């Protein structure tokens, strides 16, 4: 009898598996399926004529890796607003509103870090110091402490490197801003754009250079920015909110599924598709949309993606692990005393 039940269970599982519809990633069928579910988010096309190998390459964060020391709780007695947007709280800090482009490289772990570090330097100096911290410097020089460069890395290692070795300035690709601007070119997700197409895996990790680009002053060593401490934030909705409210944006990481690639608006919740990989982003606020609490975050897939590069994701339920991998830190303030 038990053998018969086992056969029936297997047949039932097989039938259920066959009944779950499969939609190719990046397809119109997947977009239509997500939108028909009428959830809190809306889907659309962010990647046109783009290889899935390129998209998988973008998700370059190793989840569950080395953890930064966790800071103590301090949110219990804080009165936090229902909505908070660091772009509005610190309007004189331009990096908070910036969307970067990691190009064909799994460097999201580095981008999430340098973006939040740039923001925090401005926040902690009361907007007296505004700098784009170099993703190139972190990506190319951190080495195995951070992971494998364009083949993936650890957010905790990125923040530790900032405190121990420091990071120079550096803007977007071909910007010639700062000591070491990003050297991996952006690519075009859309059909009719000015960038080259996004194809293949590509994305060789740039060579570490401890020299600024010609004509830039001060020197590489003199241009370094340091953190005094880096830490993990407890896996608590209120603790993460308090951290952002007090110190500015943080770096977070989560599991990307195929439906996230199609995000266009609303509050993202995973409803369809398989895992693509781990991805790091910058969380810069929170809010409530039509009764659904969300985190406000910045991606590094250029302004074509999502809401001009930004997105909202379900808050308070550790959705896709978004609240489990929060890392942050505080700048070493004495290096800025002459300017604040």
UniProtKB/Swiss-Prot annotation:
Sites carrying sugar chains: 38, 192
Reaction catalysed by this enzyme: Hydrolysis of proteins with broad specificity for peptide bonds. Preferentially cleaves -Arg-Arg-|-Xaa bonds in small molecule substrates (thus differing from cathepsin L). In addition to being an endopeptidase, shows peptidyl-dipeptidase activity, liberating C-terminal dipeptides
Top EC class of this enzyme: hydrolase
Signal peptide, first to last residue: 1-17
Record's keyword terms, sorted: Disulfide bond, Glycoprotein, Hydrolase, Lysosome, Protease, Signal, Thiol protease, Zymogen
EC numbers: 3.4.22.1
Active site: 108, 279, 299
InterPro entries hit by this protein: Papain-like_cys_pep_sf (IPR038765), Pept_asp_AS (IPR025661), Pept_cys_AS (IPR000169), Pept_his_AS (IPR025660), Peptidase_C1A (IPR013128), Peptidase_C1A_C (IPR000668), Propeptide_C1A (IPR012599)
Single GO biological process annotation from the record: proteolysis involved in protein catabolic process
PROSITE patterns: THIOL_PROTEASE_ASN, THIOL_PROTEASE_CYS, THIOL_PROTEASE_HIS
Intrachain S-S bonds: 93-122, 105-150, 141-208, 142-146, 179-212, 187-198
Residue ranges annotated as propeptide in the record: 18-79
Localisation: Lysosome
SMART domains for the chain: Pept_C1 (SM00645)
Gene Ontology annotations for the cellular component aspect, listed alphabetically: extracellular space; lysosome
Bilayer-crossing regions: none
Keyword Disulfide bond: yes
Function description: Thiol protease which is believed to participate in intracellular degradation and turnover of proteins. Has also been implicated in tumor invasion and metastasis.
Family affiliation: Belongs to the peptidase C1 family.
Assembly and interaction partners: Dimer of a heavy chain and a light chain cross-linked by a disulfide bond.
Protein name: Cathepsin B
Species per Swiss-Prot/TrEMBL record: Gallus gallus (Chicken)
């Amino acid at each position: 009898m038990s053998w018969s039940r086992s056969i029936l269970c297997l047949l039932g599982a097989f039938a259920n598996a066959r009944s779950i519809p499969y939609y190719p990633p990046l397809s119109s069928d997947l977009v239509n399926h997500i939108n028909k579910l009428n959830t809190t988010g809306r889907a659309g096309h962010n990647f046109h004529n783009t290889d899935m190998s390129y998209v998988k390459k973008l998700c370059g964060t190793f989840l569950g890796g080395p953890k930064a020391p966790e800071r103590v709780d301090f949110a219990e007695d804080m009165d936090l607003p229902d909505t908070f947007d660091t772009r509005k709280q610190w309007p004189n800090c331009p990096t908070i509103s910036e969307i970067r482009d990691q190009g064909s490289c799994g460097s999201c772990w580095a981008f999430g870090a340098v973006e939040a570090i740039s923001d925090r330097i401005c926040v902690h100096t009361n907007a007296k110091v505004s700098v784009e911290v170099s993703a190139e410097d972190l990506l190319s020089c951190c080495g195995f402490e951070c992971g494998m460069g364009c083949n993936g890395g650890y957010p905790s290692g990125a923040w530790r490197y900032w405190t121990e070795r420091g990071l120079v300035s550096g803007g977007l690709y071909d910007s010639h801003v700062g000591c070491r601007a990003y050297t991996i070119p952006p690519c075009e997700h859309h059909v009719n754009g000015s960038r080259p197409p996004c194809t293949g895996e590509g994305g060789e990790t740039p060579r570490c250079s401890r020299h600024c680009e010609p004509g830039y002053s001060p020197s590489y060593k003199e241009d370094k920015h340091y953190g005094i401490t880096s830490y993990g934030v407890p896996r608590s909705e209120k603790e993460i909110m308090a951290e952002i409210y007090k110190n500015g944006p943080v770096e977070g990481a989560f599991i990307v599924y195929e439906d996230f690639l199609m995000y266009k608006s609303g509050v993202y919740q995973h409803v369809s598709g398989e895992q693509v990989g781990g991805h790091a982003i910058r969380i810069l606020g929170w809010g409530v949309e039509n009764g659904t609490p969300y985190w406000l975050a910045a991606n590094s897939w250029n302004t074509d993606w999502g809401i001009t590069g930004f997105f909202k994701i379900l808050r308070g339920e550790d959705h896709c692990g978004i609240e489990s991998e929060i890392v942050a830190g505080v700048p070493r303030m004495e290096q800025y005393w002459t300017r604040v």
